[in-house]
Amino acid sequence: LFAPEREGANGRPVCSVVCIKRKNKTTTPKEENKMSKKVFIGVGHGGSDSGAVGYIVEKKANLVMALACRDYLVAHGVEVRMSRTKDEEDPINEEVRECNAYNPDLAIDVHNNSGGGDGFEVYHTLNGGTGKVLAQNIEKQVIKIGQNSRGCKTRQGQRGDYYAFVRDTKCPAVICEGVFVDTKADAAQAGTKAKQQAFGIAYAKGILDTLGFKYDTAASTKPAEPETDAETQAAITKVQRAAGLSGKTVQYLLDYEYVVELVRKLAAAMK
């Protein structure tokens, strides 16, 4: 779910304005591409801002999708910078600042939705242009992985485009809302890491289509996994040992979003 501006609007949650010292989050292709392009990926919410919460937690799903998108793009010769690569504060004004400083050819902001709806939607600028083409190309790829679409959309605000990421970025930019996390059937479309990664790869293919890059539709790359914080890893180890579970079984269970939270609660209850 996308938080629009620093002041907030229409009762939506706001992102705090935080000054953050960031590590380099730019990933450069291993081999130089003569048509080298740059893409910025905003990863919605993070840290104390969980985003929408339902059958899945938005900030976590956003990161899995974004990492998969990044890795697929890099594998096809695109340089990528992400607003975050782990669970940390990521206010929208900082995303916009980083994006403009990076000066990419295209930008996307990865989010998931709430409000009881169903399906994917993508927002682009009122001015259309390349941003609209990018939105349409991403939508086509998302439909191919089995998710229905609510359409390519715009939203009018007092300053033109309502959403800051679309309005204030200098390059063509879109906001992707993968699923509604509070609708059971729709959340199931992104209910595992593998399914979340499929969304990220679909976004990447839409970006490549817009850039005019060719890609092997049958090829697959193994996306990076989000970093597991020390507290969560300790809880996983504690429960695994107590239950006598194999590493393979644990990894299978952890593919489901709700299991991670369950493991934390079990570990806390164990003496």
Regions found by a protein language model. Give the residues of each.
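Intrinsically disordered, low-complexity segments enriched in serine/proline and basic residues
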Residues: 1-3, 9
